[in-house]
């Protein structure tokens, strides 16, 4: 099967958000200026929509540039050792008086 990576690290998420904001803002300004120049609000909406589509294609998929800072995970805790130590620890505790 295909080995498709689906994660994005925290730095990549921030980068994707900045790119998304920049692209949509840029296309919004260009669309507003062009729409005012040709006196067609529909052109503004079309240009903004194109910016949204471009922004989505650039920022939503987890491209490799958004996965450069891999997270360092801790080693898993052995659940058998943890459960046996918590059971023995409960025996030594006193119950509250009511």
From Swiss-Prot:
Predominant location: endoplasmic reticulum
Pfam families linked: SPC12
Superkingdom of origin organism: Eukaryota
Entry's localization field: Endoplasmic reticulum membrane
Keyword Endoplasmic reticulum: yes
PTM annotation (Phosphoserine): residues: 84-86, 88
GO cellular component terms attached to this protein's record: signal peptidase complex
Example of a GO biological process term: signal peptide processing
Lumenal side: 39-42
Presence of keyword Protein transport: no
Mutant lacking the gene: phenotype: (Microbial infection) RNAi-mediated knockdown reduces infection by West Nile virus (WNV) and Dengue virus type 2 (DENV-2).
Residue intervals passing through the bilayer: 19-38, 43-65
Cytoplasmic topological segments: 1-18, 66-98
Lipid bilayer topology: Multi-pass membrane protein
Keywords: Endoplasmic reticulum, Membrane, Phosphoprotein, Transmembrane, Transmembrane helix
Role according to the record: Component of the signal peptidase complex (SPC) which catalyzes the cleavage of N-terminal signal sequences from nascent proteins as they are translocated into the lumen of the endoplasmic reticulum. Dispensable for SPC enzymatic activity.
Protein name, entry field: Signal peptidase complex subunit 1
Gene label: Spase12
């Amino acid at each position: 099967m295909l080995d498709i990576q689906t994660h994005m690290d925290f730095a990549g998420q921030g980068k994707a958000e900045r790119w998304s904001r920049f692209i949509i803002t840029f296309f919004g300004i260009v669309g507003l200026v062009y729409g005012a120049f040709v006196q067609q609000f529909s052109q503004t909406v079309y240009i903004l929509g194109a910016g949204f589509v471009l922004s989505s294609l650039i920022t939503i998929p987890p491209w490799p540039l958004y996965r450069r800072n891999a997270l360092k995970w801790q080693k898993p805790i052995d659940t058998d050792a943890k459960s046996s130590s918590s059971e023995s620890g409960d025996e030594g505790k006193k119950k509250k008086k009511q």
